[in-house]
Amino acid sequence: MATYEYRSWETINLPAVSNDTYYKILDHSSNTPGSDTQGVIYEGVVLKNYSIEALDEVLSQYVSPVDIKFVTGVTEDNQSHATFYIYYTTDDWATFTYDIIIITYDWSYRSVARSVLSQPITNILSPNQYFVHTVTPATPDVVTNVTLTIDGEQILTKQISGYTRYTFEVYLPDAIRNLPSRSGDHVLIVGSSRFIIPSDDCGASYILYYLNELGGWDFLPLRGSSLRSADISRLQYEKRTVSRGSNFTNVDYLTTISDRWSLNTSYLDDSGAQKMINLLASNRVYLQDLSNSTIIPVNVTNQSCDYKTYANQGRNFAAYTIEVTASSKKYRV
């Protein structure tokens, strides 16, 4: 079982299946799987090695700023979010598994049940970057320790290299309610999120770490071309002196240097492009220079964010230019 969360305008494509699979989608958020009050709102077949695509066209109809009525006859007031159960079977329902899909109406909504607050724009990691991820405990329990693992390896202590896909899991050793148990630990699986670490990551020169709209920390490797510049301003006074030899007439008494960067992303899919607002509107952003591992606070100066898609970009993948300035200036006297 995995849990996926989407906004109503995001493209919902679930991972490819390993065998020909029949599936059904049931509603809704107030009932548990198998409840008699649930209704099948969609069903279909997906072939081996193919993914279940464009579910947003079906599920987005069930979220609305006004009251809606489910096919089961149950009315939800101001349905800002909805939960669906998607069942899979490869043996004509002799056995089955299910996942949970949560879809929300807009960016102002905050899920009280959400335990993972990070939603990275891409799943690409650089071996030299810091890994940041935010989880919250299930109230009123208190988590005193969180173990972050990728395919069983401790990512916080083990340097990972090579072009490999990793399943990302968060283990909570304390007893947390309503979470599945695994060997005495409680585990949160972030959907089917997989992080890719290319063996030759020469394309990323900078990493941005930022606070997203859910209050969680995310990161973005900048794998496009980048340019660092410096804006220089000077204050001068005129010195009464004989203008000859090495004497200065106009003397610089304060020079201000403001560093700025023009950073370009790699090509993003529709899902990644829709999350760019998290970075461009963030007021807590840090820039890491991978050439020397320095990290400084920066301010994003972009004044707008386009919600780019493959379709509205003329069947091209989206890319963004991020303009940032150093939060602190340098002075020379």
Label each region the model flagged.
Residues A2-T3, T11-N13, T134-P137, P180-S181, ...:
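Extracellular/virion structural assembly segments
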Residues M1-D200:
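Preference for solvent-exposed, low-hydrophobicity sequence contexts
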